[in-house]
Structure formats: C-alpha cells, structure tokens
Amino acid sequence: MKLIIALLFTTLTFVQFKDDISVVQFSAEFLVDKQISLRKFKQFNTHTIFMSEYKKFFADEKIEYLPTIILYNNGDEILRVHGGMSLTLPEDTVKQLQKNIDELLQNKF
C-alpha cells in the first residue's frame, strides 16, 4: 500500500511540476555547487530534479546540458538556460528568470 501511495505521489508531482509559473532546475548530484538557489522564486512552483532519479524525465524534456533551468507557464516553456560545456550557469541566470517572470505577471493583468 505504501508503494502505491508513493507512486501516486510521484506521478502527481510529475504532472504538476509545470503548473502555473514554475522554475525547474535539472541537475546531477555531482553539480550541486554549480546550481543556483531557487529560494528567490519560492512564491512560485520550484523543483530541482536529479538525473540519477528521473532519467526519463530528462529525456522527455530534452535536457542536453547540466545544469539546465527551465521556466514554465502553465506547461509552456518560456525560458531555458543551461550550463553548456562548462557545466556552469551564466552569471545572469537569476536576472533572466526574474525578467521573464515579471513579464508573465504583467501579462496576467
């Protein structure tokens, strides 16, 4: 029974991770020091997903570089920022995210 509940919870999380405004960081355990803190965006849906746990998810989202951050709005990809060959996100990643989120919020009204 616990396994069924755990699987159901995991499925719901996957379905909901792109709801409304969501900031999703795709990464790997060995890159923890290269990730950015998503605390600034805590009023939105934020998730950090590790490749070792959800390989299929990475394939479905066509993640080519780590780390990668994707901003979604109601399931639509708005912005994708990745670390490229250097495995390091650009210095202005947080600014890019905030700019796009501000635009999304302005367009809601």
Where are these regions (language model features)?
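Short glycine-/acidic-enriched loop or helix-start segments at secondary-structure transitions
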Residues: 34-35, 58, 81
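Extracytoplasmic/periplasmic, Sec-exported soluble proteins
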Residues: 50, 61, 89-93
